[in-house]
Amino acid sequence: MSLSPKQVQLFEQASKHIPGGVNSPVRAFNGVGGTPVFIKKAQGAYLWDEDDKRYVDYVGSWGPMILGHAHPDIIQAVQTAAVDGLSFGAPTVHETTLADIICDIMPSIEMVRMTNSGTEATMTAIRLARGYTGRDKIVKFEGCYHGHSDSLLVKAGSGLLTLGEGEPTSKGVPVDFAKHTLTLPYNNIEALKECFAKFGHEIAGVIVEPVAGNMNLVTPIDGFLQAIRDVCDEYGSVFIIDEVMTGFRVALGGAQSVYQVKPDLTTLGKIIGAGLPVGAFGGKREIMECIAPLGGVYQAGTLSGNPLAMRAGITMFKHLREPDFYSKLEAKLQKLLTGLQAAANEAGIAFKTQQVGGMFGLYFTDQEDITSFDSMLACDTDAFKKFFHGMLERGVNLAPSAFEAGFISSAHSDEDIELTIQAAKETFAEMK
């Protein structure tokens, strides 16, 4: 999409003092090409850019805007909280209330600690697993993103022969950190078992996205998550489910309720604060009691449990716990994806969609199943780039990467869905 001179000027100005002109790399449009659009405001299912062009939004600030942008109840909660003070650096009753809600909704969480971000949550969960077990090694899976802490910015070599000799995927991460992270193919149960047969008594924990939302959207095959549960039980390792993206998005009880698996620890993201900066990790009481001040595993944060995020989150959960909230959300998304698939079929374009709750994936491929990072890499990313820009031109905002999931909110209307399907029909016609 060609941008106005104003938008180009804004990006040039931003690039003078902000590296790459953005404060998070995916916003730079490197995955789709072109210059990022600067957003001025948001309301409900819509964004408006600095030229006052409106977009139907399927990014939702990368997931947390499940009620839509600027929901009046959330805005009221934040405004009321702000009048009482922005941050105290002391306990508040609102932290306890939100913790009670989370523990009530997710039975695997017996105790929970608030953090400032999902990265802080996963970083501390890894530290906690190591402190609890007295071991160093962590298992993660290809294509799963768990924040930008050093221990998790790692990619191991292919095959079991190179396990334990991982290399960082970011400069600035010491190789000594990488050697403790073992990376396995997602959905590969045999590789998991072989890894534990070789290193099991050295493995502190396994961390996994139950639905991988950072390689588009890849769901777990039957038995995969349970296999992780089983080997962790067998070897005394900590099973960590990263629900930063899926928590309260795919179902009220998160992906762990959808796939009926119980982790030892769970990490959560900014959805618990209705989109404000916040995260959390929680799980078994005996493990959580290893965290300071009760135990020797240190974690702290001046803004952890900040009152604005706590009160926004408490208000949001009142809506999420309403009867049929998630069934209505899923029905909306199913209608959208059915329409997109029909439009692609009519245009003769190899295209596939996938849905879990309110999350979705779009793939330009004729593959029957997308079950791994390799199968995702085999999709046509050039076709996605064309589709992205065609949709953006027509007022539909998708994630600017073929490797990111999309999200729908309760604010999306039938008219928004019809507009999106029509935009796709026109874009597919251009792509023939």
From Swiss-Prot:
Gene3D superfamilies linked: Aspartate Aminotransferase, domain 1 (3.90.1150.10), Type I PLP-dependent aspartate aminotransferase-like (Major domain) (3.40.640.10)
- GO molecular function per UniProt: glutamate-1-semialdehyde 2,1-aminomutase activity; pyridoxal phosphate binding; transaminase activity
> Sorted alphabetically, which InterPro entries does this protein's record hold?
4pyrrol_synth_GluAld_NH2Trfase, Aminotrans_3, Aminotrans_3_PPA_site, PyrdxlP-dep_Trfase, PyrdxlP-dep_Trfase_major, PyrdxlP-dep_Trfase_small
- What are its E.C. numbers? 5.4.3.8
List the pathway annotation: Porphyrin-containing compound metabolism; protoporphyrin-IX biosynthesis; 5-aminolevulinate from L-glutamyl-tRNA(Glu): step 2/2
Q: Quaternary form?
A: Homodimer.
**Origin species:** Acinetobacter baylyi (strain ATCC 33305 / BD413 / ADP1)
**What's the encoding gene here?**
hemL
Which SUPFAM superfamilies does this one have? PLP-dependent transferases
Q: Please give the name of this protein.
A: Glutamate-1-semialdehyde 2,1-aminomutase
NCBIfam families in UniProt? hemL, PRK00062.1
